[in-house]
Amino acid sequence: MTLKNFEFNVIENDKFARTGIIETHRGNIQTPAFMPVGTQATVKACLIDDVIKTGSEIILSNTYHLMIRPGVDRIISAGGLHKFMNCKLPILTDSGGFQVMSLSKLNKVDREKGAIFNSHVDGKKFILSPEESIRVQKGLDSDIVMIMDECPKKTTDYDVINKSMELSIYWAERSKIAFGLNPHKGLFGIVQGGLFKDLRTKSLNELIKIGFDGYAIGGLAVGESQNEMFSVLDDLKNIMPDDKPRYLMGVGTPADILGAVKRGVDMFDCVMPTRSGRTGLAFTWNGRINIKNNKFKNDNEPLDPNCSNLNLNKYSKNYLNHLFNTNEILGSTLLTLHNINFYQELMSSIRENIKKGTFDKFHDEYIDKL
């Protein structure tokens, strides 16, 4: 069977904001798109079929965690990640580089060997090179594959950021070679360079020379302010390729997403809606609420009376408050699904307003509210 090639087309523009379609052989993705995070082959506390019912068209999973547990060979034996977790949606996997830097007991970053580290689970030694990261992601049968890059810890040291960016470009070249010819999959480059305009510009230009199916913006959501993040996006919005999807990694809040879409970003992922859902924080069109608060004990209205999806409007704030204050697992499931559903409603509204040419008005109405 001939598999459909990976493809991206812009549909509408409203200044820098735009809608589009990413086509994969496992399904199409409307952009701007939000990807729920399924770190360890599961969107925590949720059945994948329920995640699909929220309107999610793609999810993200994590190479670092999956190569440690259960190991790529087990997933290959199951027929790939989609069959392993019974997921019909396209899946994007990150390279594992960010988690290596942030979670593991890192021993060494070697230009040729890659990242040499010990597992945060049992201390086992791993070597993650650009070639190994691509090998693992191919074994997972990911639909969108991320290159191996180095994501340094937050710093304002120009020389440190420059050295890291140069290493990431070298690893990008090796990732592209290791990926080979796989037209039915997408390989994304990752723009690094911290908060420095010249380094971000150089990183992007070098990645364009190598040639990728999409371009991610990495090294943000690591402690910088929202204004600093938007400044980086402003620096890049005029020079990012128009015909490739743009992915802002690890972002973010609804306000972050609105501001990034205004600056031309097409794709997002973040643990916020799922992690918040497990801790009792709900996103609504009127802002965030902590469902564990005592004021909801006698509130028999649903979180969102207009949300008929998954019958989520059948559950009152009174009941959800009870579930969380008695540590019942169902509370985490319901609120996680509510939050993912809210994020997908947000993305749908963003796309609709871009289509109508009213995105700026929508942005201004909600940027400080959500």
Map each language-model feature to its residues.
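Glycine- and acidic
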Residues: 154-158, 162, 214-220, 329-332
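Non-catalytic, usually N-terminal nucleic-acid engagement modules in DNA/RNA processing proteins
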Residues: 1-181, 293-297
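Alpha-helical packing segments of well-folded alpha/beta enzyme cores
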Residues: 133, 164, 168-171, 175, ...
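Short secondary-structure capping/turn micro-motifs that flank functional sites
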Residues: 67-68, 153-154, 223-224, 276-277, ...
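C-terminal extensions of enzymes
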Residues: 2-21, 29-33, 42-45, 149-155, ...
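Short, ordered coil/turn segments that flank beta-strands lining enzyme active or ligand-binding pockets
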Residues: 25, 285, 355
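Glycine-rich phosphate/ribose-binding loops and adjacent secondary-structure elements
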Residues: 166-169, 178, 182-303
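Conserved, mostly hydrophobic/aromatic
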Residues: 27, 59, 94, 137, ...
